[in-house]
Amino acid sequence: MLPEEDLKIIRKELGREPTLVEQGCFLNLWSEHCSYRSSAPLLKTFTSTGENVLIGPGDDAAIIKFEDGYVLAIGMESHNHPSYVDPYNGAATGIGGIVRDIISMGARPIALMDPLYFGPLDTPKNLFLFEQIIKGIAGYGNCIGVPVVNGETFFDRRYSGNPLVNVVAVGLCKEENVTTSRSQKAENKLILAGSSTGKDGLGGASFASRDLSESAEAEDRPSVQVGDPYTEKLVMEMTLEAIEKGYVKSCKDLGAAGLGGASSELAAKGGLGARIIADAVPQREPNMNAYEILLAESQERMLFEVAPEDVDAVLALVQKYDLNGAVVGYLTKEPTYTVEFGGEIVADIPIAFLTGGAPTCEKPSEAPTLREEGKKPETPEDLKVAFLKVLSSYNIASKEWIYRQYDHEVQLRTVVKPGEDSGVLRITGTKGIALTCGCQPRATLLDPYNGGKTAIIENSMNLAVKGAEPLAIVNCLNFGNPERPETYWQFENAVLGLGDEARKLSIPVVGGNVSLYNESDEFKTAIPPTPSIGMIGKVDLEIPLPSGFFAKDGDSIILVGETTPEMGGSEYYACMDSGNAGMVPAVPENAPELIKAIIEAVKSGKLSSAHDLSLGGIGAGLARMCRSMGAKVDLSELAGETQADELLFSEAPARALLAISEPEAVREILKDVPHAVIGKVGGETLEIKGKNFELSVSLKEIAEAYGSLTRFMMG
């Protein structure tokens, strides 16, 4: 039901009581999910322009200039609530929706990433959600032939009952084929093409704009869409062919609010109105009413604006691909949104009011009571036990069980496969892109502003170790109930942190999604603030890319960046049951210089290996690089007054490990940033020495700890 405050505004504008169909349109298009009514003022603080940005926020996806006449389409979406209610279909249709966003811009999807967040797997419900969500992503992505090349998987008890499924998609096309969702000309026809329209997904947009109740699995299942990847593949090919032949004047995929959302937004963006003939829509079920036809979120559907003379050609294309298609309306000069059904007018709304009239506001924001730092844990007597415990944490352990279910090599562009800091794809002969995603939710929980900044730095470093120059950022801003002042304060400060650090690095934030009300009645939890981002960069493939693992016996190991003792939000503190203690490490002022230096070091072509340091710090980073060969490392010179566990597990941002046969070859590049040669690659063990500790772990022990998640899931 529409809130009474909204109804008052609507009655005043219309001068009458809205019809049932009109109420449905407003309920969905004025929902938080569609209108960003709580977040719009904050989103405007992002810098979204740049020399390579052709289309920024506001369309189905952003368009970034690449090379040789090619452009990249990039978008990011969430499908959180549906993935709790029906995890397989919720995750699958999350993939389908973001892929259609890319297609609607005229681009062929070439890559996916999936930042995912779950509750602990020792709870049967969380384990079920985890398994089904991964299956849903794999089942849909593999069938449509788009590789999943990178991702993040993070576990925390606060995601119990409210997993987060975020998806990034990237597409490629020639600049002349870019299509937008801005309508072009009155009297042009609106063609609905793809799957037929059923009753699935009704109210999906409004469902995504409230907390999950204990009865959500039963009550909200009709709000979850059901996907068909084989139809999606046909829709993809049909749409791209129609665009390449010049038939499509504007295009929008049908997602939130279904035909009602797509047709009204497309028309309004071009300053036009629309008249929809609901009876003309190809229907999957008998006796559907106008409300259902207009607002169902059935998947695999696209809306095209087509000139009258091209209608027959487009419908012939639709038939060629064995899809459903029909003219369902037309654009009008009058700026109204009119829906006809059964010969009667069931909706007649000023279109700008429908698509842009939702009242936006900044919610009350209140900082929480100042948190006590708490007591840091004593340094463990047996450091090796702590080391292996951290390494076997599912947040750090190998995610091989996940990405082995994905086809990450389809389309034959993949240069760097999943399991490294970033995925790399070949675009043209010598140019490629690097892709990375994620954030650090525990750091953002303790310090939202610094957590937002850290997300930008962490992803920038993931690109840097592959020599990639950042091009653009997209985001999924996942938070709890914004009506709680403390939650809105978290949201506000995380957004400001993201924006400030992105500006400092001159990376535009070109699009994304806001997902609020992520709270679970069943588990009595609210998610930690999760400003998940996707980042894309340009890579020169003429230069040999360093491996994320030690690759050459005898290489010198260089640590770049400063290690600080702040441990707040760290995986080590979580493993030691001190999760709320400590201060979050600050992003260093010289982070841009550190990132630039690492990029230049990689571009020198001299590095054998390079790896960003994040969760688990130096200890976990070294262990991860010891996949097939060991290392001897001496951290004594770095220690100062730092405790052994802080030295090993600090997650101070903007640090990396480099391996090179001749360190002098990059000394000039690194001369203006903190760095030190800390050891050599070789042997069958990882040996780490500090001022007052020595640690020796065999490659077998490392492999066993690092394989904990795979072993559990295969168990």
From Swiss-Prot:
Active site: H33, H79
GO molecular function, one term: ATP binding
Pathway terms, separated by semicolons: Purine metabolism; IMP biosynthesis via de novo pathway; 5-amino-1-(5-phospho-D-ribosyl)imidazole from N(2)-formyl-N(1)-(5-phospho-D-ribosyl)glycinamide: step 1/2
Pfam families xref list: AIRS, AIRS_C, FGAR-AT_linker
Binding, Mg(2+) 2: D101, D253
Residue positions binding Mg(2+) 1: E77, N513
Compartments reported by the entry: Cytoplasm
Presence of keyword Metal-binding: yes
One of the GO BP terms on file: 'de novo' IMP biosynthetic process
GO cellular component, one term: cytoplasm
Disulfide bond residue pairs: none
UniProt-annotated binding residues for ATP: Y36, N475, G512
Record's subunit section: Monomer. Part of the FGAM synthase complex composed of 1 PurL, 1 PurQ and 2 PurS subunits.
The protein, known as: Phosphoribosylformylglycinamidine synthase subunit PurL
Origin species: Methanosarcina acetivorans (strain ATCC 35395 / DSM 2834 / JCM 12185 / C2A)
Gene: purL
